[in-house]
Amino acid sequence: MIPQVSQEIIDLGDGRSISIETGKLAKQADGSVVVRLGNCMLLATAVSARTSNPGVDFLPLTVDYREKFAAAGRFPGGFFKREARPSDSEVLTMRLVDRVLRPLFPDDYHAETQVMIQLMSHDDNVMPDALAGLAASAALAVSDIPFYNLISEVRVARIDGKLVINPSRTELEKSDIDMMIGASLDSVAMVEGEMKEISEAEMIEAIKFAHEAIKVQIHAQQKLRAKLSSQEYRTYEGEVEDEAVYAKVKAAAYDKCYAIAQEASGKAERGEKFATVKEEAKALFTEEEYAENADLAGLVGKYFYKTNKEAVRNVILEKGIRLDGRKTTEIRPIWCETDYLPSVHGSSLFTRGETQALATVTLGTSREANQIDSPSEQGEEKFYLHYNFPPFSTGEAKPLRGTSRREVGHGNLAQRALKNMIPADCPYTIRVVSEVLESNGSSSMATVCAGTMALMDAGVQMVKPVSGIAMGLITDGEKFAVLSDILGDEDHLGDMDFKVTGTADGITACQMDIKIDGLRYDIMEQALAQARDGRLHILGKLTETIAAPRADVKAHAPKIITRTIPGNFIGALIGPGGKVIQELQKATGTTIVINEVDEQGVVEILGTDPEGIKTVLAKIDALTFKPQVGEAYEVKVIKMLDFGAVVEYTAAPGNEVLLHVSELAWERTENVADVVKMGDVFEVKYLGVDPKTKKEKVSKKALVPRPPREDKKE
């Protein structure tokens, strides 16, 4: 059977085009497409259950993105030679797509839904993560799954002042903006990226530019759907509703929730008070009513949440009072401390309200760099950040199941916020670890602040300190309130989570998630302006604690010295089977790493003992010392022989040469000891390699004038 293939082409306007094709692959999925740009091909599939599982009151959506090694003509690493758990880059792409899709499904759609995106063919000039959102939305578009508000995602960069959509990796290296934008036709839903200290106006310009490109891609999806014979969305059983129950719960709970929202209480106290009101709402109904109506308990819980959310939002909109009593632009109290942990290379504590992060910095050689090996990217990171969010940080006891997607995403955001402030000539590999010890909103921004101070405490010469803030939004369509430094509850009950990091001079990273349709750009501009004021306030608190990086690393932290040697000396420094370098490391207590770069050997010496480092440098100097013919060098006698003296260059201890008896003096020398003695230091002239003996020659007499010859007596 010949497949019925439908296709749409998207012209990118720069000689490139994206094709979206359906009808050839994975036809048993509810929807499947192949998206292609150059030789990069992504297969995206969408499948959703026909019914919801009982008791499920949320959308169980799974977005999975994988890059197949075969796509790049490579074998997977490891013993089993098979793709295993997703890499961090794959997890980050999953999150980018999920965050745009999830809020645009119908609120009452609770069927198990799975969107899978696979890189099937790789192109070195195409970054596949920028096509994943388009592929996912297109797979939903050609299905009967009720996803009415199509989306797409693009990467926007600015290269030499010009904005570019979906640049290549090579082009991106020259860019000062790297942002992923996800949007529907009407509004931007997601922003994430890093920048090199750009202004708020420049960021808005880039978002608008990307949104126009996204609209073109959404129109292409609509055209593709229109070509299909079946364009009907499936019917589904939505949530059970009962207006009478809602009215009863709201009448009993709204005023109480409204009052609690104005009391400026702490997280735990406020939670207990809301829980009491919820129990009172449950008690409005008898045991017989619960027994007769299996849905009643779930309805009461749902309607209480709805009532509570409405009350809290209205207090903010009507009175400008937040749950903890702050004004909309007010930042929570901040206290900071550096050098908290005595044995680590750098540490800091950052506490803002009920959110606390403890950051540590570890310094190492290039051997400790984070290796990246995926079908679409190979390389290493010399600066990386890990974010840990244990359950006790929110007062909970939960199973520990390894690093979560959320931890990967938050760590990546904080890493991108700081990375461009690490000097390009920093010789260290740097690992920052953030332990979130308390959390009540914007722990990732606390990580940025703690990370900045820990880096400065470690003696890393940051270009500029970085701070971060999370902004929120409450709107009813007419009135709106932009909230600075949001609480966890304000994140859950609000319409936006907008994290912004930067220096005093510009934005370094951002992450925005919009939960409503049609966010106006003027609101976004106000949020960015308000975020800047908040960032600068927080930055002032950081610099009050530590005004500048330490002049040097701490005494117990390793110091690193880098020395470049000719490539042909690498083998001599390593020695047979690594003997020379291993003995040198053991004797000096150092770590020595050698990398070959452009036919040169880049030697990194890491150690806590300055004398040990000096010994290694002296050994390198000795091994690589190469005297020039005709030049004079200072030497020291280390051995006396009948036919001369063995001397070593004082500039390269261990580098020895024979000073032959015939080169000691112009006069005939019967006894070497008559001219030089053990330990004598003097200069010799380097004569080069003797063509007969193939050994190096030096001369002491060549540096003194030759005495005139005496005429023979007749």
UniProtKB/Swiss-Prot annotation:
Family assignment from sequence similarity: Belongs to the polyribonucleotide nucleotidyltransferase family.
Any one GO MF annotation of this record: RNA binding
Subcellular location: Cytoplasm
Record has tRNA-binding as a keyword: no
Domain S1 motif positions: 630-701
Gene symbol of the encoding locus: pnp
Protein purpose: Involved in mRNA degradation. Catalyzes the phosphorolysis of single-stranded polyribonucleotides processively in the 3'- to 5'-direction.
Gene3D superfamilies in the record: GHMP Kinase, N-terminal domain, K Homology domain, type 1, Nucleic acid-binding proteins
Annotated region (Disordered), positions in chain: 694-714
Chief site of localization: cytoplasm
Name of the protein this chain belongs to: Polyribonucleotide nucleotidyltransferase
Organism the protein comes from: Flavobacterium johnsoniae (strain ATCC 17061 / DSM 2064 / JCM 8514 / BCRC 14874 / CCUG 350202 / NBRC 14942 / NCIMB 11054 / UW101)
CDD domains named in the record: KH-I_PNPase (cd02393), RNase_PH_PNPase_2 (cd11364)
Cofactor: Mg(2+)
KH domain: residues covered: 558-620
Cellular component GO terms held in the UniProt record: cytosol
Coiled coil start-end: none
Catalytic activity: RNA(n+1) + phosphate = RNA(n) + a ribonucleoside 5'-diphosphate
InterPro entries assigned to the protein according to its UniProt record, in alphabetical order: ExoRNase_PH_dom1, ExoRNase_PH_dom2, ExoRNase_PH_dom2_sf, KH_dom, KH_dom_type_1, KH_dom_type_1_sf, NA-bd_OB-fold, PNPase
GO biological process terms, semicolon-separated: mRNA catabolic process; RNA processing
Catalytic EC class: transferase
Keyword Zinc included in the entry's annotation: no
Xref: HAMAP family: PNPase (MF_01595)
Binding positions for Mg(2+) per the UniProt entry: D491, D497
E.C. code: 2.7.7.8
UniProt entry keywords in alphabetical sequence: Cytoplasm, Magnesium, Metal-binding, Nucleotidyltransferase, RNA-binding, Transferase
